[in-house]
């Protein structure tokens, strides 16, 4: 059984669903929590995945308390009915943590996809760092995307025989979504300009950090008339309010509704550079040859920084302004970042995970 509930999880788990369904030795059941609703459904449709169970927990202004209690109350019935041999969860969301906790209560083995990412600061990112550390205590199968993730798990005392380095399933997803023939009206609008993709939504960046981020972006945009930006905005009303205040009203910055995964990956592949506080984009962009400025104070993906394709710029206005300006003005710096190696795998992570399950279950 696979359980997931948010758009980022779905992007990385749907390719695994489809790979597992090819394996006749396995019976695959999919349960979604609906922690994100509209954005989750867009991904399910893009990968042609139909859940067997949908807990539909999302409600307006839901808190971490709401998400946790609603999933815990509803997942119990599904797990008791299906009695799975293993439950696969992904990464670090509340869906992931609560599902793993429910499995622990019912003594059902857990497989953790994208295991071993760490900042070792449980409040950054919040609550994700706590979630993934807690799941690692529970999990029987640990599918680490990189060798560094494996080393983190070994340092924490995980059994070496429980850890499998697979690569990241995000790269598998890109193989099916990025298309040379793709077109979109927004990309036509940006043609002839350097296109900047913006994403920003992290809980710990809400408020002043996000204001600093957007002020820096607006300043740089004002100084570079050959640049256009597209920001597929998150559904969170707080994010929308801040974005409208600092980025609204500029005819070279298009704030648009969330894109489905096929659109989003193709926008990334046609961008000049990316400004983000997202985790998943830090993995996707290197395989597309796109420099990324990470607007966070910490990252659980240091492999991309070591490889040179990511740069951690924090949330201070002047730092973001300086680094964004440099990438637009310094061709050598840009070329070095765009040609850096991709540390996140070869697009065969799902096959490796499926192979492990066929061998061991």
Task: List PLM regions with ranges.
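Nucleotide-activated sugar donor-binding and catalytic core shared by glycosyltransferases
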Residues: 1-231, 236-361
């Amino acid at each position: 059984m696979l359980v997931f509930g948010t758009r980022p999880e779905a992007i990385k788990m749907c390719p695994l669903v489809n790979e597992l369904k090819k394996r006749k030795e396995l019976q695959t059941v999919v349960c979604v929590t609906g922690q994100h609703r509209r954005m989750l459904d867009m991904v399910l449709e893009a990968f042609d995945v139909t859940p067997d169970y949908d807990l539909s927990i999302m409600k307006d202004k839901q808190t971490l308390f709401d998400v946790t209690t609603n999933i815990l109350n509803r997942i119990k019935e599904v797990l008791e009915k299906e009695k799975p041999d293993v439950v696969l969860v992904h990464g670090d969301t509340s869906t992931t943590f609560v599902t793993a906790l429910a499995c622990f209560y019912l003594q059902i083995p857990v497989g953790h996809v994208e295991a071993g990412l760490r900042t070792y600061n449980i409040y950054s990112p919040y609550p994700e760092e706590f979630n993934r550390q807690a799941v690692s205590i529970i999990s029987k199968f640990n599918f680490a995307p990189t060798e560094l993730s494996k080393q983190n798990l070994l340092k924490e005392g995980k059994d070496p025989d429980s850890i499998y380095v697979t690569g990241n399933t995000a790269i598998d997803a890109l193989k099916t979504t990025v298309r040379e023939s793709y077109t979109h009206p927004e990309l036509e609008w940006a043609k002839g300009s350097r296109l900047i993709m913006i994403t920003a939504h992290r809980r710990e960046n809400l408020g002043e950090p996000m204001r600093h981020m957007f002020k820096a972006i607006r300043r740089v945009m004002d100084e570079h008339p050959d640049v256009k930006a597209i920001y597929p905005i998150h559904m969170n009303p707080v994010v929308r309010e801040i974005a409208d205040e600092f980025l609204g009203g500029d005819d070279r910055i298009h704030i648009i509704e969330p894109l489905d995964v096929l659109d989003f990956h193709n926008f990334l592949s046609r961008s000049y550079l990316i400004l983000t506080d997202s985790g998943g984009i830090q993995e996707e962009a290197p395989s597309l040859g796109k420099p990324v400025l990470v607007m966070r104070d910490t990252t659980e993906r240091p492999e991309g920084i070591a490889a040179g394709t990511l740069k951690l710029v924090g949330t201070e206005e002047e730092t973001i302004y300086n680094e964004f300006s440099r990438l637009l003005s310094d061709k050598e710096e840009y070329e070095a970042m765009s040609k850096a190696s991709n540390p996140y795998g070869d697009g065969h992570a799902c096959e490796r995970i499926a192979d492990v399950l066929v061998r061991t279950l």
